[in-house]
UniProtKB/Swiss-Prot annotation:
Disulfide bonds: none annotated. It comes from Dictyostelium discoideum. Residues 237-260, 366-376, 425-479 have a biased composition (Low complexity). Coiled coil: none annotated. This is Putative uncharacterized protein DDB_G0268590. Residues 377-388, 395-419 have a biased composition (Polar residues). Residues 123-156, 209-264, 355-479 are annotated as: Disordered.
Amino acid sequence: MLKKKGFSTSFPNEDFIDNQDTISNFKIKKEDFLLDFDDTYEQLNMTTPKGKIIIQGQENHSPFSLKSFSNLSFDYNRPLSPKTHILNIQDNNNNNYSPILKRVNKTISPSLVSSTNRFKNSLSCSSSSPSSSSSSSSSSPRLISTPPIISTPSSPMILTSSLDKFDEILSENEFMSLDNSVTSSSSSPSSSSCSSPIVIKTNATTSTKIVTPSSSPSSSYIEDAPSTPSPSKLFQSLSFKSPCSSPSSSSSSTTTPKSSINGGNIIKKQLFSNKRIQDIKIEKPSTKIDLHPSKLQIKSNLKIKPSLPYNSTEVTANTKTTTSTTTTTNTTIPTLSKNIIKRTSSVGLSPTLSSTQLVNKSSRKSISAATTTTITPHNNNSTMTTKTPSKRSLDTSNLSTPKSTSSTINKAFTTSTTPLKKPRMSMTPLSSSSSSSTTPSKFINPLPSSSSKTTTTITNSKRLSTLSKPSPITPITPTITKTTATTTTTTTTTPNKPTNKRLSTLVNTAQKPRKSYAPPPSSHISDELEQRIQEALLAEANGNYTGGSVLTHSSPQKVEQSEWSPIRKKSTLHDVHACTKKNY
C-alpha cells in the first residue's frame, strides 16, 4: 500500500483488490471522513476521502500533471497571456510578439541580403550625386523595383495599406523598413531643402506610397515602431499619417519638427514602448491654483474667538495698517505652541524696562518688533503700539525720569525670571518695582511718556521642562517697510458670569414635561389581571389544571402533550384523552 506522511490513499483498481495483504493491513483513519467545514486551512490541501491530493482547489487527475506542462505544444497564433506580454515589454525582449504576429523561424536567404545591399548602394549613389542632377530629377519621381528590405525585428516597419496582404507578408518574413532609406537619401548637402521623392514598389502591394523626406510639418511621416509591437501599434504603422489628419493626436505630435542639418525626416522617439501607454492623455495643469486655507493672505480685521475655559480671556486683535502705494505689509500670526518665554527685567532708577523673548529657531529670519505697552489691570485692557524695530526707540525715548538705564547698565541689573503658571500669558512685567501695576487708567492711550516699556522678540525653542504653556493668542507682529506704520490694538475681556459649559451648548434650555412610556393607568386592565391570577390560584387549589400552573410552572397536561404532539401546544383535556386513546 502506498503510504505517505499525513494521509492514507486508497485506489479502487484491480491491483489493489488482488493484494490481500494490503487489505488486511488497511486502517481507517479519522482524516478520511472529515467534512468540508471540518477542515482547517492546513488540512485542506492534505487529503480527501477519494485519496487525491488537492492543491489550490484543483485535483491532480494524473501523476504526470506537473510535468505535462513542458510537453505542451505552444501555438503562436493564440494570444499571449497579459503577464508574459508585460514581461516582454519590461525586458525589451524581441523574440515574443503580440498575438497578431506569427513567429517565423526561417533563416534569411543570402540572395535577399544581397538585394538589400544593392538597394542601399543605389540609394547612396543617388544621394551623392551633384546638386544639378538632384534638382533635375526632383520633378519626376524615381521608381525603384528592387525587392523589399528585410530588417531586424527591432524595427518592423511595414509599408502596406491593404490588410488582406498583411498575412502574406508576415508569412514570407518581408518586413519593410524606411529608416535606412530615408536617412541615406537625405544625407547629401544638396537635399537640405527638399530631396527627390522615392517611390517604392513591392510585389505584395498594389498601391505605392511616396515618401518625401522634407522638414515641412505637412509632410507625411511614419512613427518609429517599438521593440515589442502591440496590435494597435502594428495597425498604425501600416498607413502613413500626417500630423494634422488625426483629431486624437496629442499636442506633442502636431508640433513642427526642428529642421536638422541634413534636412531629412526627424524620427519620432517614443517615451514608452507600448502604444496603449502612449495613448494616455497628458492633462495640462489648470490655471486655477488651489491653495490650502492656511496659505491664504490674512485679512486686515481678525477676530480670534477660541474655545477658552472660564478663567481665561477673549482676545480681539484689530490691526490698522496705513501703507503707501508702493509698499505692502505681510502680517503673520506666529503660533506659540511649545515655546520658551524668557523674561528679563532690569531694576534701576528709571521705571521698569522688561523684555519678553520667544526664541524661534528656524531657517527663516525671526520676526521681531519693538512694542511699547501700557497696562491698566483695573479695566483688564491693554493697548499696544507697534513701532519700527530700532535701537533708537529704546534708548532715545522721552521718559519722565532721567535716563539712568542705558544698554550697558541694563545688562548689569538684568535678572531673568520665569512666568507663573497661568492659563494665559500675562502681559504685566515681573519686576521688583510696582510702577506698572499701579498705573492709573489715564494711560490707555499710548504716549511717549509711558511708565513701562516691553520689548517683545518672537523666537522658538524646544526646552519646555519647567515652563508653563503660553497662550496660543499673541499680538500680530507684522514685517514693516520704511514707509509703513502698523498699529495693533489688543483688547482683553473676561466673561461676566460663570456660565455652565453644558448649558451654553444647548439651543433650548427650557424644561419640557417628560414623556411617560408606561401604559396609561386603566382600572379594568389591572382588575382583569388580578382576576386571572385569582382564578389560576383557585384552579390549582381545586386540582383543575386547565390553563397550566401559575406557581409551579408545570402541569400534567403539558407532559401528556409532549408524549404525542409536540407541535400542538394548546389543547383541551378532552382532546388529549381522545388522541391518546386512538394511539393505543
